[in-house]
UniProtKB/Swiss-Prot annotation:
Its EC number is 6.1.1.15. It catalyses: tRNA(Pro) + L-proline + ATP = L-prolyl-tRNA(Pro) + AMP + diphosphate. It comes from Francisella tularensis subsp. holarctica (strain LVS). Keywords: Aminoacyl-tRNA synthetase, ATP-binding, Cytoplasm, Ligase, Nucleotide-binding, Protein biosynthesis. This is Proline--tRNA ligase. The lineage of its organism: Bacteria, Pseudomonadati, Pseudomonadota, Gammaproteobacteria, Thiotrichales. The gene is proS. HAMAP family: Pro_tRNA_synth_type1 (MF_01569).
Length: 565
């Protein structure tokens, strides 16, 4: 391919909202062009990267025994009303109606149409298992689309759906898809971690996310440094302390004056307390109107997902207002505690492990010290309600937990009958009885993984692609291509030879100044740069540069071809 035959649209101008490196470099390199908020045109170079990712995904899905299909982008409201998601999805669902005033939406995900197709075509267990996938454009009307294609309104996704007679069959395909996603990310060449995850709005039971490791990642994932345990922070847990080893304190409770101290940080600073000896008491109100006092150690944070999953809580909960708190405690937030607490207490294991703790006195401007569980506070329940922190012992007892940032690029679920049951997608089982098919759901963000790759690997000059998805493996950069017959002859022949060897190559024949060519090559991220000029040709040499290592060599063309092979 010659550069003059495609559109290389590099630019130095950037919109203010481009804060992530991936967003900046995709715009500067001319991979995408903004059309509207959260909606982008895929330019030729960007589309090449996208297609390479799609090809890897498609190849691995086919190897795993999945079959490709294509569902409509526009979905009738009746389907989503069967699962009640027409209203539950909220404003992210882009709704429209046709000339006959029938309601439709732009598909944000495709569980309903795939189940509709399956219930009409799959009638017996003999047709199962079946795994179907598509690579398609989705649309979710994000309230604040940001970070370029990382959180766009329109995006490209591979979504697969599997159908089964029983749970063991579903688990087998789930495990196959888990391995397939690992193969995809290995083949692309990204550092990643599969982590246990919350099922969220999709529903179902078992669930894993596939997180590309990157500092700009919105998700926090935790993993053990001594085992294969890994989980999203929403679900991550820790080895519970042995509460039987708590020391029985002989110290008596003391009430201390703490004027104008409303935060743990200020309390510890002004009163010289160890923050690990303090607790925070936060009041919530569940969906049934019940109030609870949630208690965690002073240096810990509540975990919303864990709290909403508690049997005692009618989800979703909200934080109690200042007025509600005062009406219950006759004290303001910042002075609340567990001693003589008027509402039910749910305390985290780490808070329960503290002896002689410090807490609010349920009276403004006062705190208690030397408060002890069981001796002073007996009416409480224990639960895991906090985020894990670095240094927590892994729940399997092997190693300690570490935290890092990740970008979610894949998510797999065991849906069971969450969609098939309400949509009456039934089969005749081996026992001759009718029952709902069980389902798995497997999503992979094709356009998102492109941004994740940039976040994981770049430098001050531009993108450093994994070679498997670089827009071109090799860029031939001829100096004075349009003026030197020798340079043109060598560059043209090398281009044809590399193409003949199956190497994806771009010949930059634009006639741009060397500095512009070199800067564009670094910015766009071609994996291998080949500079051809009269001076080196006189010695039978060309200059080779590896984009990833920045290593430069003056070598012969024969040596170059051997190196690239």
């Amino acid at each position: 391919m010659k550069a003059t035959q495609t559109l290389i649209a590099t630019t130095k101008e950037l919109p203010k909202e481009a804060v992530l490196i991936s967003h900046q470099y995709m715009l500067k390199a001319g991979l995408i062009k903004k059309l509207a908020s959260g909606i982008y045109t895929w330019m030729p170079l960007g589309l090449k990267v996208l297609q390479k990712i799609q090809n890897i995904v498609r190849d691995e899905m086919n190897k795993a025994g999945a079959s490709e299909l294509l569902l409509p982008s526009i979905l009738p409201s009746e389907l989503l009303q069967e699962t009640h998601r027409w209203d539950k999805f909220g404003p992210e669902l882009l709704k429209l109606h046709d000339r006959h005033n029938r309601d439709f939406c732009y598909g944000p995900t495709h569980e309903e149409p795939i189940v509709d197709m399956a219930r009409d075509t799959i009638k017996s267990y003999k047709q199962l298992p079946l795994n179907l996938y598509q690579i398609q454009t989705k649309f979710r009307d994000e309230i604040r689309p940001r970070f370029g294609v990382m959180r766009a309104r329109e995006f490209i996704m591979k979504d697969a759906y599997s159908f089964h007679e029983n749970s063991q069959c579903l688990r087998n395909t789930y495990n196959t898809m888990y391995a397939t996603y690992c193969n995809i990310l290995d083949k692309i060449g990204l550092a990643y971690r599969p982590v246990k995850a919350d099922t969220g709005a999709i529903g179902g039971d078992n669930s894993h996310e596939f997180q590309v490791l990157a500092n700009a990642g919105e998700d926090i994932i935790c993993y053990s440094n001594g085992s294969d345990y890994a989980a999203n922070i929403e679900l991550a847990t820790y080895a519970k302390p042995d509460l039987s080893k708590r020391v029985n304190s002989q110290n008596t409770i003391e009430k201390i004056h703490t004027p104008n101290i409303k935060t743990i940080e200020k309390l510890c600073k002004e009163m010289s307390f160890d923050i690990k000896k303090t607790i925070k008491t936060m009041v919530i109100k569940d969906a049934g109107g019940n109030f609870f006092a949630l208690v965690i150690r002073g240096d810990h944070e509540l975990n919303e997902t864990k709290i909403n999953k508690l049997d005692q809580i009618i989800a979703p909960y909200t934080l109690a207002t200042k007025e509600e708190i005062f009406s219950i405690f006759n004290a303001n937030p910042g002075s609340l505690g567990i001693y003589n607490c008027p509402i039910s207490i749910i305390a985290d294991y780490s808070a329960i492990a503290i002896t002689d703790l410090v807490c609010g006195a349920n009276e403004d401007d006062y705190h208690f010290t030397n408060v002890n569980w069981d001796r002073d506070v007996t009416n409480y329940q224990i639960a895991d309600i906090r985020n894990v922190v670095t240094g927590d012992i892994s729940p399997d007892g092997k190693g300690t937990l570490e935290l890092t940032n990740g970008i979610e690029v894949g998510h797999i679920f065991e849906l069971e009958d969450v969609y098939s049951k309400p949509m009456n997608a039934n089969i005749i089982g081996q026992d001759g009885k009718s029952k709902p098919m069980l389902m798995g759901c497997y999503g992979f963000g094709v356009s998102r993984v492109m941004a994740a790759a940039i976040e994981q690997s770049h430098d001050e000059n531009g993108i450093i692609w994994p070679e498997s998805i670089a827009p071109y493996q090799v860029a031939i950069l001829p100096i004075n291509y349009n003026k030197s017959d020798k340079v043109k002859e060598v560059a043209d022949k090398l281009c044809q030879d590399l193409l003949g060897d199956g190497i994806d190559v771009l010949l930059d024949d634009r006639g741009a100044r060397p500095g512009v060519m070199f800067a564009d090559a670094d910015l766009i991220g071609y994996s291998h740069h080949v500079v051809i000029g009269d001076r080196l040709l006189e010695q039978g040499l060309i200059e080779y540069k590896n984009r990833k290592t920045q290593e430069k060599q003056e070598i012969t063309i024969a040596e170059l071809i051997k190196l690239l092979k």
